[in-house]
């Protein structure tokens, strides 16, 4: 979301980092709401990708008076969510979204809070699956090869010399950047699996 207040200029190049998770576990029914964080400073030319009909000078003006946040909810695991390869070699993505109600509640609360702080307009730009980051899942970790791809140390059940140390073993990203946890898991796998001796 972009929060705009034409009375306040925000012409920074490198915006400070801010994030809040005050409502993370406030979703009820087992679905967390998520996190809200600044995404850096969006420039007018960047806005052009989703506002093609708006003149660039106007987008630059808006950008000079806005702050931009990503409102990210946890994508909880679901057995029907999967990536497969079709007979013709095409990648097939099946995704069942189970937390949209709670995501919309998080979005509502974030907008309400930004309005209370004086922002005059708030614009939402939803991203579909083609705008992906923080990919997690698809190589389920577990002890049973019938229901999982890797063990707890990311070692493939089918190929014992193959370790899949990326975000695939996560059941969820927890609405956070998984990079540090992936790095920690890689160090754990190397230490516990004697890979350092290879």
Report each predicted region and the residues it spans.
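Glycine-rich loop(s) and the adjacent beta-strand/alpha-helix scaffold that form part
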Residues: 1-12, 166, 179, 185, ...
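Mid-to-C-terminal "cap/lid" subdomains and adjacent gly/pro-rich loops that border
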Residues: 1-67, 198
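Structured loops at beta-to-helix junctions and adjacent beta-edge loops in soluble globular domains
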Residues: 5-7, 23, 71-75, 142-144
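A general structural signal for short secondary-structure junctions and capping/turn motifs
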Residues: 10, 58-63, 75, 130-131, ...
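Fe(II)/2-oxoglutarate
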Residues: 56-58, 85, 114-115
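A glycine-rich dinucleotide-binding beta-alpha-beta segment and adjacent secondary-structure elements
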Residues: 68-70, 92-93, 98-173, 179
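Active-site beta-strand/loop architecture of penicillin-binding DD-peptidases
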Residues: 73-79, 172
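Short His/Asp/Glu-rich catalytic/ion-coordination signatures at enzyme active sites or charged loops
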Residues: 81-95
């Amino acid at each position: 979301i972009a929060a705009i207040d034409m009375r306040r200029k925000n012409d920074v190049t490198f915006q400070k980092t801010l994030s809040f998770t005050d409502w993370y576990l406030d979703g009820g029914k087992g679905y967390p709401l998520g996190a809200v964080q600044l995404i850096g400073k969006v420039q007018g030319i960047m806005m052009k990708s989703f506002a093609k009909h708006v003149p660039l000078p106007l987008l630059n003006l808006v950008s000079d008076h806005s702050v931009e946040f990503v409102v990210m909810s946890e994508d909880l695991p679901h057995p029907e969510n999967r990536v497969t390869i079709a007979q013709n070699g095409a990648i097939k993505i099946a995704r069942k979204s189970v937390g949209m109600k709670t995501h919309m509640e998080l979005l509502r609360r974030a907008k309400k809070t930004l309005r209370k702080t004086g922002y005059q307009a708030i614009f939402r730009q939803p991203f579909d699956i083609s705008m992906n980051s923080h990919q997690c899942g698809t190589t389920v970790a577990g002890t049973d090869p019938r229901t999982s791809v890797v063990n707890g140390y990311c070692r493939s059940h089918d190929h014992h010399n193959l370790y899949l140390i990326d975000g695939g073993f996560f059941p969820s990203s927890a609405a956070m950047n998984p990079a540090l946890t992936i790095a920690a898991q890689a160090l754990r796998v190397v230490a516990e699996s004697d890979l350092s001796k290879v």
